[in-house]
Amino acid sequence: MSQKILIVIPARYASTRLPGKPLVKIAGVEMIRRVADIAASICRHNPDCSYVVATDDTRITDYCAEAGIPAVMTSETCRSGTERCWDAVSRQAEQPDFIINLQGDNPLCPPWVIQQLIDEWKACPADVFTPCIHLDWAEYDNLVESKKTTPYSGTTVLVDKNGYALAFSMGTIPAIRKPEKAR
């Protein structure tokens, strides 16, 4: 029995910091097109995979229709990308076995990250997967420095010895009081 995978791309036009963000062009290509291309490339390599843009704005669905990108209208009451994903999933005729939330403002997501999520799920099914990377000291230093000017960019995760998430934070966790001694 094949397992159905659905990549949902939540896209909100009414962004506070950058209204119309999904349709902003990056090097001449709309951001939502770039993210949809990532999803499409994953689906080409996974026969039971499909993708859909989830939005509450007709400007985005109109663009998607013109560009040949599958899209679904969601409720205007969704408070987050995750809620928008769930709303889109609930509107599907056939319920997927595995749902991937690929944020519509993530045009630089490497496709191998999504493929690895799929591979991990197939190898060891679980309810939730969150990709994360282990930082070396140079990367940690860069993260700490960038948090000084953009404190809410990026999420850190604390994992146990088996890789299970214990906590997520917009701050840097775990707190390392004297990193020079821990190196």
Regions found by a protein language model. Give the residues of each.
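Glycine/serine-rich loop-strand microenvironments at binding/catalytic pocket rims
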Residues: 1-9, 62, 70
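N-terminal glycine-rich phosphate-binding loop and ensuing alpha1 helix
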Residues: 3-55
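Short beta-strand segments
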Residues: 10, 101-103, 131-134
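Alpha-helix N-cap and loop-to-helix initiation/capping positions
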Residues: 24-27, 73, 145
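Short, high-confidence coil segments that cap the C-terminus of an alpha-helix
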Residues: 48, 94-96, 123-128
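Short phosphate-binding loop-to-helix
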Residues: 58-119
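Conserved core of the sugar-phosphate nucleotidyltransferase
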Residues: 109-183
